[in-house]
Amino acid sequence: MPTISHFSRRATLILMTLILLGSAFLRFYGLGAMAELLHGDEAYYGLDALSLVENPRLQVYFPANTGREGLWMWLLAPMVAGLGATPFALRVTSALVGILTIAACYRLGRESLGQQAGIWTACAMAVLYWHVQLSHIGLRVITLPLMGALAFAVLFRAHRLGRGWWLAGALVGITFYTYTASIMYVGYAGLWMLWWAWHNPKQRRGIASALLMIGVVVAPLLVSRLLLTDATPSVLRAAASDAQAIGQNLVNWAWAWTGRGDVSSTHNLPNRPVLDIPLVVLAIAGFVGAWQLIKQKWMLIWWAGLVAVALVPTVLSVETPHFLRGAGLLLPCVMLLGVGATWLTHWRYGRWLVVSLLVIAGTHTLIDFDTWLNTESDDFGITYDYRVNEGLYLLDTLVDSDLQIMMPGVVFHPTAAFISAGLNRDIIFYDWLSDEDCYLSPITEYAVLDLPIELNNFPNRVPPFVETLNTLVEDPELDYRIHTITPPQAITSGWESAPTFGEAISVQLIPPERATFASGEPIAFQLAMQINTALPRDDYRVLVHLQSDPTPYEGGTLYATGDTALCSLAYQASARDSDLVALQPLSLTLPDDLPAGEYHVAIGFYTPDTFERLPLMPTENAHDYHRAWEFSVSE
């Protein structure tokens, strides 16, 4: 039987087609089961891609979520545009990139090790569990092995043929847009080009063009990173603390290949090693056969160096072995396996042994990923992502599609934001602190996804601010509750004619149920405020005065005051939809000696330092207060 290196172009095409079909099966398997499963980091990418669809622009760096390079969002945007804002759109993009990586690995293996090794390198990447797992999650790291393989393959081709340097430089530069750790690949490629230029004067001009192209391509991202430095603290937080920690990281990675792998259920079937027994056999064969098979010995140095530079980002960080930060190791790993497979095929029945080992490894990968789907997918992401996934999709089936969704107690949740966008539903987040005694409410019926892990005791806190509370679902483990709420009748209309202060705060007072009180009684009521524009300050106070006719401004008596700070939620509402109303409880205590008669509550807003009041429109008086409610005091 001839070796693959003697196969025709047609035979190679058939083999690669079969390999790609097998890799596609492994990477598309389980996507249906993950259709309603979304990680917070994936959601951030999806939201950025959605923003590109809604507002097309050339943006190379996205500062949200500690800052991310732009290539992944550019790839996601057309899929989100075509398939909608769904977890499936993100994951199918990742799977497709993973499949393309198999083809790129063939090219890299062929350029560096020969055609036969290229075939086996592609096979190794196709069945490697590490890469299959990454191909199922919508994180930008999946682009690193693809662009790394393409960049190095074209770079080696340019070095071999003495042409195509500009394309090599462009691909190396684009690699910088994949993942934080890509800086090691880009820097390493640059060092090799400088080395080649030193030893081969004929290639200096081409290498110079490649280096120039790298500089041109990476410059926009470098500038954006320098201008947006918010990502720096996150990098430092993930850094190893000292030399002892770095040493332990090296030990952890040494053990990760055959012993204990990444513990994260996002990146791995927890603790699964990189290599199972069939791939360990190929790896050992790779170490044995590398010197014999690799004719250009400098390639061995390049290979070892690639391992070293790919280890740097993960060895210098925490939580090793970390299969995201260490993703640069995928290429040297599968190249080692490809060399091992090639070496074994020189032995009698070696080809069948290699095929058997790869089939077994692929079967292990399929079984282990199925195990991950059945046992670990609930832990996919941060603590409460799965609650949001399950709760929102269930809410969508139970609640009318035109109802707004509220998530009080959550400042912002990317998973909920992306899923709600895909469901074409409006969702509002706001931080409802435990000591916050006011509330944000839509003016029409709305739904609430209540996460007890984020906001304790919502059903007991909200009744003073609602007309009715209907709990549709209460998860047995209290992971989430789903409510529908009818707001107070008083805030559902009348805003067009409501008095407005400073052209910013429209008000309506929600009075007590009765309008007659006795002296000495406390009176509790709510002030409903619709914020029409951003407030210029964050320290306004609410004027709450008990008056009668004549008013204090006309020589009458100011009987009581209940002035208080404007609640913080009013400032949150100022940046949101005008249909959102801040409800702030207010109170006055009637003096014990208050005479019987007719009284009114005056409402206004002022600054605490100058006591300057916000002007009232339409004007009711010269003192910018609104006569909000009238009541009687009995004998």
Language model regions located:
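Membrane-integral, polyisoprenol-dependent glycosyltransferases
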Residues: 2-241, 245-345
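Extracytoplasmic/secreted proteins, especially bacterial periplasmic and envelope-associated proteins
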Residues: 44, 70, 74, 249, ...
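Sec/Tat-exported extracytoplasmic proteins
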Residues: 53-56, 258, 331, 398-399, ...
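Residue-level preference for long, well-ordered alpha-helices that form the structural scaffold
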Residues: 41, 144, 380-384, 575
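Active-site-adjacent beta-strand anchor residues
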Residues: 39, 145-148, 406-409, 448-449
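C-terminal luminal/periplasmic domains and tails of membrane-associated envelope-modifying transferases
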Residues: 392-405, 411, 418, 424-635
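Membrane-proximal, lumen/periplasm-facing interface regions of secretory-pathway glyco-
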Residues: 34, 273, 352-402, 406-433, ...
